[in-house]
């Protein structure tokens, strides 16, 4: 006999442990029997689970975690993820999530090339947008703590007041509809220049028609600083409200508050961008040419008699 209990941010006591909603970090499983307490921060938890009759499943090798060294890494199928704080390296416990899809087709910067203006990653909106007088440079790409990134410089004296927009998808690449909630996330750091003569960075979600015409826009400021990229993951969720003409959504990193006649020179690092049809961000899902889905995590105890459960007495 196998029971099914949803995870609500705490560990249920028996049955199949599955997630329904935001990511859960599970640190202990108790309330079963004194000799069945499970420590999900232990390095040997996977062996302990197997020895006690539990089966962990997650199809596919697209799930990621932050390891004990602070490096973002992919994890093999059917392998429990023990996650860590990317800044303090503290163990957060077992990471259990529902299924999720990264709709950004290229989050690993495939096809990007340094230069002025250089080449943005394949399937990104190209070129980057800014008011007249603003130029762009792809400074380079690389990997930092397992996070694939691109460095983009925006500089010059604008002749109009507007935002600088770096679109991480084409105008029609992600099909969407009004009423849907989408969440964009990305690691962002300042690596050159400053935000002088701007109001700082931001994340945005731009609504367009199925043919790519502008419909509506929403964005939020983010406080971007210099330093290590790890720990600088920002998110923005928005319910699309453009009406019947909305047919696509475009995730963007912004430089906000650029004003006419005031020069700017800023270089930002963008890493591991993600776009999900959810109200919240889940763990990063790498992509290179197409949207990718991470399957749900599930922990099952097939024989509840092993924890003293007698179905005849229930």
Which residues are covered by each model-predicted region?
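Extracellular and organelle-lumenal recognition/adhesion modules and their flexible linkers in secreted
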Residues: 2-314
């Amino acid at each position: 006999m196998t029971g099914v209990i949803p995870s609500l941010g705490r560990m249920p006591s028996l049955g199949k442990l599955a997630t329904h909603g935001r990511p859960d970090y599970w640190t202990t499983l108790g309330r079963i029997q004194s000799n069945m307490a499970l420590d999900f921060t232990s390095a040997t938890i996977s062996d302990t689970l197997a020895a006690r009759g539990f089966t962990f499943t997650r199809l596919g090798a697209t799930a990621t975690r932050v390891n004990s060294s602070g490096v973002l890494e992919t994890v093999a199928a059917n392998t429990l993820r023990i996650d860590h704080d990317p800044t303090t390296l503290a163990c957060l416990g077992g990471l259990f999530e529902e299924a999720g899809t990264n709709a950004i087709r290229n989050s690993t910067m495939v096809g990007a090339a340094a230069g002025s203006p250089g080449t943005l990653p394949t399937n990104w909106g190209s070129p980057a947008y800014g008011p007249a007088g603003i130029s762009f440079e792809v400074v380079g790409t690389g990997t930092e703590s397992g996070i694939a990134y691109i460095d983009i410089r925006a500089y010059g004296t604008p002749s109009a007041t507007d935002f600088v927009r770096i679109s991480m998808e084409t105008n029609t690449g992600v099909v969407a509809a009004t009423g849907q909630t989408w969440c964009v996330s990305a690691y962002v750091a300042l690596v050159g220049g400053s935000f002088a003569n701007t109001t700082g960075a931001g994340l945005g979600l731009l609504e367009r028609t199925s043919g790519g015409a502008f419909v509506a826009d929403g964005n939020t400021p983010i406080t971007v600083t210099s330093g290590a990229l790890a720990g600088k993951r920002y998110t923005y969720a928005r319910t699309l409200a453009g009406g019947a003409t909305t047919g696509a959504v475009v995730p963007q990193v912004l430089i906000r508050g650029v004003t006419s006649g005031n020069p700017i020179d800023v270089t930002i690092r963008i890493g591991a961008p993600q776009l999900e049809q959810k109200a919240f961000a889940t763990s990063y899902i790498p992509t290179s040419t197409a949207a990718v889905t991470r399957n749900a995590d599930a922990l099952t105890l097939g024989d509840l008699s092993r924890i003293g459960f007698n179905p005849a007495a229930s």
